Curated annotation (Swiss-Prot):
Annotated PANTHER family: RNA-BINDING PROTEIN
Keyword Ribosomal protein on entry: no
Compartment annotation: Nucleus
Stated role: Necessary for the splicing of pre-mRNA. Binds to the U -enriched regions of plant introns.
Superkingdom of the source species: Eukaryota
Gene coding for it: U2AF65B
Domain remarks: N-terminal RS domain has a very strong bias in favor of D over S.
Residue ranges with Basic and acidic residues bias: 38-145
Name of the featured protein: Splicing factor U2af large subunit B
Main location, first listed in the record: nucleus
C-alpha cells in the first residue's frame, strides 16, 4: 500500500515545485479538513457580511427614503402651512373686504334709511300739506256752499258741530260784507253816480297797456263769455270814452270839468242833474284820456263830440278799443241822441268826425263780428285816419257791415281804395271806394247777426237790464244759491245776516228771500235777496255800498226793484 504520508512531498516534487490545485474531496472520502471549515466559514462570514452590508445599505436606503419622506412630508406640511396661511390671509382679506363691504352696506343702509326717513318725512309733510290744502279747499267749498252760516247767539257753545257753528267774526269774513266795494280815485268836486251794473276797478292813471289790440277770436265767431264777465266788461267799457289829442297841460280836473260842461250844454245829460263825468284817467306821455260817464246813454251821446276843440286842440272822441257793441246794446243806446244841440258847442252833425267831403271812403262787405278796433287797424295800414264811423243798428248796436272813413292825408285815398277793394275777409268780400262815387247809395247789409249772438243779447237783456228809477226796494243777485235755502236753520241765519248787514244803511223794513218749492216746482226769485227800506235815501245808500262788493266769493249786483212788483209778490223781474 502506498505510503500516503510522503505523498505530499512527492507530489510537490512532481509538479516541479508548484502546488497542484486542490482536489475536491469526495463525500464518501475521509471528510472535510479544517481548511475546508475555515474556508467555508470564511465564505459564510463573507456572505453574512455582504448580507449585513446589503442590510445596512437597505436600511440606509430605507432611512434615506424615510428621510426623503420626512422631507417630503415636511415640504408638504410647509406647503400646506403656506397654503393654509395663504388661505387664512385670503380669508382675512375676504373678511376685511366683507367687513368693508358690510360697513359700506351698513353706511349705505343707514344713508338709505336716513334718505327714506327724509323722503317719508317729506311725503308726510306733503301729505299733511295736501291734507291741509284739501281741508282748506273743502272748508272754502263749504263756506261758498253755505256762504253765511253764523251763530244767532254770541253765547252759543263753541263745541257745537262745525257745520252748524257760525261765529260772528267768521260769518263776517265768509259773507264778504266786511269788504268795501271797489273804489276808484274820484275827482274832487265831482259827484260819483253809480252805473247800472257794477264794473271792475279802473286802471291806474298813466298806465294803459294794450291800447288798441285785436280782440281774441278776431276772425272767428262771437266769443262766448260767462255772464258775470260779460256784465263787468260791457258795463264799464260801455260807459268809458277815449279822448285823444289832449293838450300837454291838460289834467284830470280840467278834462272832467270841460266834458261835464259840454255834455250839459248839448243836452246830453240823460241820467239826471249833476256832472256826467265820473272819472278821468290821463296818460300824460301819450296825451290821451279815458273819460268815464255815469251811464251808457251819456257815453253814447259823448260820441257826437268827436272833433271838439279843447283848450285850442281838436280832440278825437272814440270808443275804447275793448268796447263790445253787442254787450253794450243790452245796457242802453249805442248811438248819440239825434236831438243833441251840437251847435251850442260849435259842432254840427255833418262836421262831427270830419266824415263829409269828396275824400270820404265807403267800406262795405265787412264781417259782422269785426270790431271797430280791427277795422281801424286794417284801414290805418295806409295812414292815420281823420275820421271813422262804423254804422250800427240803433236797436241792437251790432255792425251793419259797412263803415265810412277819411284819411288825414287825402292823397292816400285812391291808393287805399285800390288796395282794399275785393279783398276776402272771412266769408265776405270788401267793397272799398269813394263814398260819392256813383249815383246810388250803398245798400246796407240785411243779414242778421249770428244766431248765437242774438241769443246772448236776449239773455243779457233779460238778466242785466237795470232799473233806472230809484225805489225803496233793492234786489241783490249773486249772493246765495238755491241749495243754501233748503235747510231751515241756514235760511234763518241768512235772514239774520242780511238784516244785520243791510240794516246799517237806514231803516230796513223787510227782507224777502224766496225759497225753492218743496215739490220741486220752479219758484220765481230764487237766488235773489229783496231789501225794502223806509225811504229811497236809505236804499240808495245801500245800493251804493253793496253794489260790486264781494259776497261769498261772488260780486254782488244791487239794482233798484219796482215797488209795485215787490208789493204784488212778483219776484221774477
Amino acid at each position: 500500500m502506498p505510503d500516503y504520508e510522503g505523498n505530499g512531498e512527492d507530489i510537490d516534487n512532481y509538479t516541479g515545485g508548484s502546488s497542484p490545485p486542490p482536489k475536491s474531496r469526495s463525500s464518501h472520502g475521509h471528510g472535510p479538513t479544517p481548511d475546508d471549515y475555515s474556508d467555508s466559514k470564511s465564505q459564510h462570514s463573507s456572505r453574512e457580511n455582504e448580507k449585513d452590508r446589503d442590510s445596512s445599505r437597505s436600511r440606509e436606503k430605507d432611512r434615506e427614503r424615510g428621510r426623503d419622506k420626512d422631507r417630503d412630508r415636511d415640504r408638504d406640511r410647509d406647503r400646506g402651512r403656506d397654503r393654509d396661511r395663504g388661505r387664512d390671509r385670503d380669508k382675512d382679506r375676504e373678511r376685511e373686504k366683507d367687513r368693508d363691504r358690510h360697513h359700506g352696506d351698513r353706511h349705505r343702509d343707514r344713508s338709505d334709511r336716513r334718505e327714506k326717513e327724509r323722503t317719508r318725512d317729506r311725503d308726510d309733510d306733503d301729505r299733511h300739506r295736501t291734507r291741509d290744502y284739501d281741508q282748506q279747499r273743502e272748508h272754502a267749498k263749504d263756506r261758498e256752499s253755505r256762504h253765511r252760516h253764523r251763530s244767532r247767539s254770541r253765547g252759543r257753545s263753541e263745541h257745537r258741530s262745525r257745520s252748524r257753528s257760525r261765529s260772528r267774526s267768521k260769518s263776517k269774513r265768509i259773507s264778504g260784507f266786511d269788504m268795501a266795494p271797489p273804489t276808484s280815485a274820484m275827482l274832487p268836486g265831482i259827484t260819483a253816480a253809480a252805473g247800472q251794473v257794477p264794473g271792475t276797478n279802473p286802471p291806474i292813471p298813466g298806465m294803459f297797456p294794450n291800447m288798441f289790440p285785436l280782440a281774441s277770436g278776431q276772425f272767428g265767431a262771437l266769443p262766448v263769455m260767462p255772464i258775470q264777465a260779460m256784465t263787468q266788461q260791457a258795463t264799464r267799457h260801455a260807459r268809458r270814452v277815449y279822448v285823444g289829442g289832449l293838450p300837454a297841460h291838460a289834467n284830470e280836473q280840467s278834462v272832467a270839468t270841460f266834458f261835464s260842461h259840454v255834455m250839459s250844454a248839448i243836452g246830453g245829460n240823460t241820467a239826471g242833474p249833476g256832472d256826467a263825468v265820473v272819472n278821468v284817467y290821463i296818460n300824460y306821455e301819450k296825451k290821451f284820456a279815458f273819460v268815464e260817464m255815469r251811464s251808457v246813454e251819456e257815453a253814447s251821446n259823448a260820441m257826437a263830440l268827436d272833433g271838439i276843440i279843447f283848450e285850442g286842440a281838436p280832440c278825437k272822441v272814440r270808443r275804447p278799443s275793448d268796447y263790445n257793441p253787442s254787450l253794450a246794446a243790452t245796457l242802453g243806446p249805442s248811438q248819440p241822441n239825434p236831438n243833441l244841440n251840437l251847435a251850442a258847442v260849435g259842432l254840427s252833425p255833418g262836421s262831427a268826425g270830419g266824415l263829409e267831403g269828396p275824400d270820404r271812403i265807403f267800406v262795405g262787405g265787412l264781417p259782422y263780428y269785426f270790431t271797430e278796433a280791427q277795422i281801424r287797424e286794417l284801414l290805418e295800414s295806409f295812414g292815420p285816419l281823420r275820421g271813422f264811423d262804423l254804422v250800427k243798428d240803433r236797436e241792437t248796436g251790432n255792425s251793419k257791415g259797412y263803415a265810412f272813413c277819411v284819411y288825414q292825408d287825402v292823397s292816400v285815398t285812391d291808393i287805399a281804395c285800390a288796395a282794399l277793394n275785393g279783398i276776402k275777409m272771412g266769408d265776405k268780400t270788401l267793397t272799398v271806394r269813394r263814398a260819392n262815387q256813383g249815383t246810388t247809395q250803398p245798400k246796407p247789409e240785411q243779414e242778421s247777426v249770428l244766431l248765437h249772438a242774438q241769443q246772448q243779447i236776449a239773455l243779457q237783456r233779460l238778466m242785466l237790464q237795470p232799473a233806472t228809477l230809484a225805489t225803496k226796494v233793492l234786489s241783490l243777485t249773486e249772493v246765495i244759491s238755491a241749495d243754501e235755502l233748503n235747510d231751515d236753520e241756514d235760511y234763518q241765519d241768512i235772514l239774520e245776516d242780511m238784516r244785520t248787514e243791510c240794516g246799517k244803511f237806514g231803516s230796513l223794513v223787510n227782507v224777502v228771500i224766496p225759497r225753492p218749492s218743496p215739490n220741486g216746482e220752479p219758484t220765481p226769485g230764487v237766488g235773489k235777496v229783496f231789501l225794502e227800506y223806509a225811504d229811497v235815501d236809505s236804499s240808495s245808500k245801500a245800493r251804493q255800498s253793496l253794489n260790486g262788493r264781494k259776497f261769498g266769493g261772488n260780486q254782488v249786483v244791487a239794482v233798484f226793484y219796482p215797488e209795485n212788483k215787490f208789493y204784488e209778490g212778483d219776484y221774477d223781474g
